[in-house]
Amino acid sequence: MERIKGLRDLMSQSRTREILTKTTVDHMAIIKKYTSGRQEKNPALRMKWMMAMKYPITADKRIMEMIPERNEQGQTLWSKTNDAGSDRVMVSPLAVTWWNRNGPTTSTIHYPKVYKTYFEKVERLRHGTFGPVHFRNQVKIRRRVDINPGHADLSAKEAQDVIMEVVFPNEVGAKILTSESQLTITKEKKEELQDCKIAPLMVAYMLERELVRKTRFLPVAGGTSSVYIEVLHLTQGTCWEQMYTPGGEVRNDDVDQSLIIAARNIVRRATVSTDPLSSLLEMCHSTQIGGVRMVDILRQNPTEEQAVDICKAAMGLRISSSFSFGGFTFKRTSGSSVKREEEILTGNLQTLKIRVHEGYEEFTMVGRRATAILRKATRRLIQLIVSGRDEQSIAEAIIVAMVFSQDDCMIKAVRGDLNFVNRANQRLNPMHQLLRHFQKDAKVLFQNWGIEPIDNVMGMIGILPDMTPSTEMSLRGVRVSKMGVDEYSSTERVVVSIDRFLRVRDQRGNVLLSPEEVSETQGTEKLTITYSSSMMWEINGSESVLVNTYQWIIRNWETVKIQWSQDPTMLYNKMEFEPFQSLVPKAARGKYSGFVRTLFQQMRDVLGTFDTVQIIKLLPFAAAPPEQSRMQFSSLTVNVRGSGMRILVRGNSPVFNYNKATKRLTVLGKDAGALTEDPDEGTAGVESAVLRGFLILGKEDKRYGPALSINELSNLAKGEKANVLIGQGDVVLVMKRKRDSSILTDSQTATKRLRMAIN
């Protein structure tokens, strides 16, 4: 106070004021400080000082022709004196006003196109709804979030090539645009930005915003999709939150959301297939999301979710080194352990063989609704600090941590037998057995864990076995914190391997992911997901399986027919018949298959009994492993629409109805396609590649005249040769057999020769 009073006295004397305002600054250190380097040391002061001058702006000399010397009020707009050290003109701020009012105008058509992301943001905010403000403690955790709504997902390198091609097309150096998305975007942008007068650097900068995903590691307490992150500063503070509903969605958020749903569906489906890994790859390669190939999205999209990462691992892509257990992402922050197989007894005296982690380790656990720090030793939980949105979320985290710690208390709390199975009816591994057991009911676990008195630590409270908070007691080693645990920030990706059961391991052999970790949550995808793979037919229910199976047979009838007569085993093993098996009552599968295969063999053996419609109808039943039995069936049952429906072996039924007049097949009333050949001419098989009574000699030979249709062949004399047009427009040379005895074997050799002749 004394000093301030003294200074006030000093300032009241006029001499002091004069010294401070008039004296020149000639101390070398001060001059040096403010004049060395290009960096402005006091920008605010500099701006004030410059703007106080009459002509603070310099401009190119051409300005003298474009702007009058004085404005309407007679104020001078520019000075004739040159700027010291350059040949530019000194200009008044009034010149800027004049230029804005009277200067040349330009077309604004390109502005919404170039500044698209800004225009869209304004629209989203205009249509968004801001709700009430709530004051409460915010548990924020840092997460890697997308801060740039409405972008494509190109890599920085791909985007750079696109930008160069669009903005500077004549620059040296050939830019190779490879991906489909690159080519599409380049074409679209070139058309949009024709005759654009906006500075190329600005266009390039704005294009980058549109093409590349930008992520930041930010504290978030609510939604993490980019349309929420762009208003983060409006929706959450340290002790308040404002409700907000975005006024529009952006494609990048929709892609992320739909990718997760597609990946989960595919992993779930692959798990129950005979070869999960190859099935998963087949599905990823044949699926499209919003019209873009799923494999292209997986290569570019950095979304980290269990199912998505399993798909990436299968494609040989790198993924994050953290691992997943019980839906939480674990990252070891210190310590180390060795794994040892050990047999332990549960509270129910069941023996479990588990891989015990020996040693002290610390982990961070991050889930959607709760986070935690876990310190553990060999089969012992030392400390767990957990924070979450609500009681339920905190309980979930505690259960996962207790199971993961392999603590003796947890093992002893098991009541009843552990026999959980996965979708493919295989027993889960012991750790997941334990997890499922306690997720179903954790009462005994919490009751048996033990409680301890707690010290009063700022920001921490205890939690009792019934999950209520307490300031005196807590579950042994467990505390609830107000602060969240940050997500693992590194974007480092590691090389991983995947086995045929979709277990993903790092290079040290630690399991990072397995199908058990894939969430069962069902959602509705924002973008259309098109699964072309037969394995996904069942996603829309049993009816869709039935219709799709028969549609597939009809679409591929030409090749199916040849295989049916030549190589039935290969045909029966086709994966397209796999989904159908789930519709056939389990007890009947083998019997039906044996019956149908026998029937088909009789058709092959006895000339003239080839019945197209019947083969199509019964073929899917022959795919199951056959049981030898003498049983005959007049109808076969399939489970659709929640009950057993009959397919008649001979004749039509509501399930399978062939209309001879229109040659169209309807399955459960849905059109399944048309048969191109007339089933009545079964043995002739107008389009058939099986030419009975003829020998295929090889490729077309022009000396034998123009190609005949199969019908014209009957006019040939024995031993005569002719070119003939078969199935898919291929022409081959044939000879009519001299004797009829070997007709039966023709069909076998015909197809083999056909293949050779055509290829």
UniProtKB/Swiss-Prot annotation:
The keyword Methyltransferase does not apply. It is found in: Virion; Host nucleus. A motif (Nuclear localization signal) lies at residues 736-739. GO terms for cellular component: host cell nucleus; virion component. InterPro entries: Flu_PB2_2nd, Flu_PB2_6th, Flu_PB2_C, Flu_PB2_CAP-bd, Flu_PB2_middle, Flu_PB2_N, INV_PB2, PB2_helical. GO terms for molecular function: RNA binding; RNA-directed RNA polymerase activity. Keywords: Cap snatching, Eukaryotic host gene expression shutoff by virus, Eukaryotic host transcription shutoff by virus, Host gene expression shutoff by virus, Host nucleus, Host-virus interaction, Inhibition of host RNA polymerase II by virus, mRNA capping, mRNA processing, Viral transcription, Virion. Pfam families: Flu_PB2_1st (PF20947), Flu_PB2_2nd (PF20948), Flu_PB2_3rd (PF20949), Flu_PB2_4th (PF20950), Flu_PB2_5th (PF00604), Flu_PB2_6th (PF20951), Flu_PB2_7th (PF20952). The record marks 627 as: Avian adaptation. The keyword Transcription does not apply. GO terms for biological process: 7-methylguanosine mRNA capping; cap snatching; DNA-templated transcription; symbiont-mediated suppression of host gene expression; symbiont-mediated suppression of host mRNA transcription via inhibition of RNA polymerase II activity; viral RNA genome replication. Belongs to the influenza viruses PB2 family. Influenza RNA polymerase is composed of three subunits: PB1, PB2 and PA. Interacts (via N-terminus) with PB1 (via C-terminus). Interacts with nucleoprotein NP (via N-terminus). Plays an essential role in transcription initiation and cap-stealing mechanism, in which cellular capped pre-mRNAs are used to generate primers for viral transcription. Recognizes and binds the 7-methylguanosine-containing cap of the target pre-RNA which is subsequently cleaved after 10-13 nucleotides by the viral protein PA. Plays a role in the initiation of the viral genome replication and modulates the activity of the ribonucleoprotein (RNP) complex. This is Polymerase basic protein 2. The gene is PB2.
